[in-house]
């Protein structure tokens, strides 16, 4: 099946979905209605672009016909030639858009994410920068209409973040934030620096798709679950009832502790969400490392310690090293307006995948 047959088939299916979604029998079946609604939403942009493409093809045909029937009228012929020229340029643009829209979708793109940020090299300054990154992602989430929930956090003495785990929920969260995993470097003058010297610090970010229990089954025998009393500042026990939960995945020694909630069950549920995502991510990374060709077709090397971006405060500059993008908009980006960076990463990734398909 060539690309045009594929697009026509997709348009036929889209029209069929429209009829199904207005069928009372389907509407009464909540599960099926939701599945079909999702399929319809996922094909909507491709079908709309294909219909615009067909309009362009018709414009080319009309312009060519007008030239033939101009009867030598130079004004009509010139107008038709100009329209033909513009339509041919638009045709090429739409063909590229359609190729990108037909690229195989990442099955995780529609998922919520678990976001982890840690202060790394640089002590207090790294922890403060980790807090800046948390604020940036939280503001970006708000601008997208997503829900941002801090699930677990530990702070240092100067208000910085040692480690934070957050759940980001909404439409296509993973598709936009999946490129954020890696080491983020900051260059700035710390508030404690009396000589005005620029210091370099690092925070690491990990983005994992939320994994439902039906998608990834962890054998209960592989888990050790400990229950203990939650502790507050200074280490004192804050609950008379043991509500804090520690879960260890024994085969990988991945550990999650949760004490943010007031009940043991809520802490356990949140801890399971995190450990399921971490264990799935652990084995996904192993599989990815074994597939060199696949890794080359994605942004970066896949190494979680890879430096992906530098934030230079004195120059108000952000540089994404994977795609060579430099923007003099650090203040804007840290305020949560990340669209320009994310759009560039998405476009680069799509271009790389297209080149791989065309080889």
UniProtKB/Swiss-Prot annotation:
Gene Ontology MF terms in the entry: translation release factor activity, codon specific
Modification note: Methylated by PrmC. Methylation increases the termination efficiency of RF1.
InterPro entries referenced in this protein's UniProt entry, alphabetically: PCRF, Pep_chain_release_fac_I, Pep_chain_release_fac_I_sf, Prokaryotic/Mito_RF, RF-1
Keyword Protein biosynthesis: yes
Region (Disordered): 288-308
Location of the protein in the cell: Cytoplasm
Keywords attached to this entry: Cytoplasm, Methylation, Protein biosynthesis
Superkingdom of the source species: Bacteria
UniProt main location, coarse: cytoplasm
Entry GO CC: cytoplasm
Annotated positions of the N5-methylglutamine modification: 236
Ranges of Basic and acidic residues composition bias in the record: 293-308
Biological function: Peptide chain release factor 1 directs the termination of translation in response to the peptide chain termination codons UAG and UAA.
Similarity comment: Belongs to the prokaryotic/mitochondrial release factor family.
Protein name: Peptide chain release factor 1
């Amino acid at each position: 099946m060539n690309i045009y047959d594929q697009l026509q088939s997709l348009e036929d299916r889209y029209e069929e979905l429209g009829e199904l979604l207005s069928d009372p029998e389907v509407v009464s079946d909540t599960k099926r209605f939701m599945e079909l609604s999702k399929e319809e939403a996922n094909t909507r942009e491709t079908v709309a672009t294909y219909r615009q493409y067909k309009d362009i093809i018709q414009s080319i045909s009309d312009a060519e016909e007008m030239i033939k029937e101009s009867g030598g009228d130079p004004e009509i012929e010139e107008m038709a030639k100009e329209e033909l020229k513009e339509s041919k340029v638009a045709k090429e643009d739409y063909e590229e858009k359609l190729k990108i829209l037909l690229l195989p979708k990442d099955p995780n793109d529609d998922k919520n994410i678990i976001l982890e940020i840690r202060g790394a090299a640089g002590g207090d300054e790294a922890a403060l920068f980790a807090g800046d990154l948390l604020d940036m992602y939280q503001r970006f989430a708000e601008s997208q209409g997503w829900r941002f929930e801090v699930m677990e956090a530990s702070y240092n003495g100067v208000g910085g973040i040692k480690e934070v785990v957050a759940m980001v929920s909404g439409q296509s969260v993973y598709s936009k934030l999946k490129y954020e995993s890696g080491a983020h470097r900051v260059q700035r003058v710390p508030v404690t620096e009396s000589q005005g010297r620029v210091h370099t610090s690092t925070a690491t970010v990990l983005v994992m798709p939320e994994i439902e229990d039906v998608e990834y089954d962890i054998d209960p025998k592989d888990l050790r679950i400990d229950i203990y009393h939650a502790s507050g500042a200074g280490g004192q026990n804050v609950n008379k009832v043991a509500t804090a939960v520690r879960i260890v995945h024994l085969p990988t020694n991945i550990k999650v502790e949760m004490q943010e909630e007031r009940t043991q069950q809520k802490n356990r549920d949140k801890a399971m969400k995190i450990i399921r995502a971490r264990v799935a991510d652990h084995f996904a990374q192993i599989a990815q490392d074994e597939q060199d060709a696949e890794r080359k077709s994605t942004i970066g090397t896949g190494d979680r310690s890879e430096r992906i971006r530098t934030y230079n405060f004195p120059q108000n500059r952000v540089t994404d090293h994977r795609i060579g993008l430099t923007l003099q908009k650090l203040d804007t980006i840290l305020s949560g307006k990340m669209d320009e960076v994310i759009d560039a990463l998405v476009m680069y990734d799509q271009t790389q995948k297209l080149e791989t398909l065309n080889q």
